[in-house]
Amino acid sequence: LGINVGALIGHSAVRLYVMGEDSQKREATDDEIKQMVEIVEMAMKHGALGVSSSYVDVDENFDPVPSRFSCIKEKMALAKAATITGRGVWQVVPYFIDMETQLKNIQELGDISLETGIMCTFQPVLSTPDAPKAERIMEALQKERDRGAKVFGQTMPRCFDLNMRLSETSMLLFGMPTWKSIM
């Protein structure tokens, strides 16, 4: 039995490499997007499976990670670059803290898929199977597939459990408006 591993290109890592500290301050310029596209194309030619990005993650200082500062133009360009080998996936962590924002993330993934032809996935779909939240997510996914987009949610085959320490960064705590100022 072999190891089942595939490498994804980190959107935040590519932004940080190209833009330095500005990657967590602003949108990329056209030249910076071009540089990022070249990196993604090179990685895909060397065996990467696609790009990973995030709508929700924060760094050790509770600041949004670089990918959260990207505009749709950048996302489209990198997703398109990830398809040059005939394969490619755009994998994201949605902003699962807020349902309406998460639904907008799903629609944006649909737009990216339709524009570039890439398959988009997001994980986690956090909910119980009978919860209204899960139903809304499934409806949003179906709506995107009805438009012709390749957008799929992923989840675990078991209950989601979370071990947290107040001394460490937690995306869930970031969703609480006063948490950053307290820490």
Residue ranges and their predicted role:
Residues 71, 101-102:
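Phosphate/oxyanion-binding active-site loops and adjacent basic polyanion-contact surfaces
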Residues 1-92:
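Catalytic pocket of metal/acid-base enzymes, prominently hydrolases
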